[in-house]
Amino acid sequence: RKSYIEYAPKAKANLPKPKNPLEAFLPGHFIPEMSLAELNMSAAVKNNDMAIITIGKSSGEFLDRKISDSFNLTKEEKDMISGVCNAFHKAGKKVVVILNVCGVIETKSWIGGPDAVLLSWLPGQEGGNCVADILAGKENPSGRLPMTWPASYNDVTCGADFPNTETVKVGDVLGM
């Protein structure tokens, strides 16, 4: 935590500055993941009973998802999962990945690494307390997903139609 608190302001300062004042109303750039090289992994393993990795993804107006870094994990995220799993498993300690995501993501390529994956979706204000209760064993995270998670983007049924690059005029749609 301390390493990230020191990393985040420096990384944010390196983000590109808006060129247009209207960009202040649009979603900003996300800071890149901190590399594992910047962490003292041996101290992290020694000082913790387990590792918790949180992967967050979001989308919304002006922030459509991309296959490369929203549906698929980035190289940095995959490296983080692999590196943390290797270090903690070597010491006989567990690793949990928490997915704080707005939609399905590819999991097939990395799901074998962590000991558990918890899908929290977008849990809101009390999400941290809910996740803590699950990790502490106070609550059972049982449930069923109301959908199937695709193994690859090719399995997403609407994938062929997104992003839609065809221009449609409102008048044409309304018959005007």
How does the language model describe each region?
Residues 4-28, 91, 100-176:
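Secreted, periplasmic, or luminal enzymes acting at the cell surface/secretory milieu
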